[in-house]
């Protein structure tokens, strides 16, 4: 088994973990309705890139 040679300091541990943070989902505003939705996903009322592509919850 691999065993560390020397103990890592809290500072080095923090430096290693500095890139582990998760970012939130990218959001867009639908130009037709002004509704917020995830990028590259159909908005809840059925619009995608300014066009009605499916029945939404309003219909």
Curated annotation (Swiss-Prot):
It comes from Alkalilimnicola ehrlichii (strain ATCC BAA-1101 / DSM 17681 / MLHE-1). Residues 49-59 have a biased composition (Basic residues). It comes from the Bacteria. One of its GO terms (cellular component) is large ribosomal subunit. Residues 1-59 are annotated as: Disordered. GO terms for molecular function: structural constituent of ribosome. Keywords: Ribonucleoprotein, Ribosomal protein. InterPro entries: Ribosomal_bL32 (IPR002677), Ribosomal_bL32_bact (IPR044957), Ribosomal_zn-bd (IPR011332). GO terms for biological process: translation. The lineage of its organism: Bacteria, Pseudomonadati, Pseudomonadota, Gammaproteobacteria, Chromatiales. SUPFAM superfamilies: Zn-binding ribosomal proteins. This is Large ribosomal subunit protein bL32. Belongs to the bacterial ribosomal protein bL32 family.
């Amino acid at each position: 088994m691999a065993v560390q040679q020397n103990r890592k300091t809290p500072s080095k541990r923090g430096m290693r973990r500095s890139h582990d943070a998760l970012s939130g989902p990218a959001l867009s505003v639908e130009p037709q309705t002004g509704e917020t939705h995830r990028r590259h996903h159909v908005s809840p009322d059925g619009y995608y890139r300014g066009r009605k592509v499916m029945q939404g919850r309003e219909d």
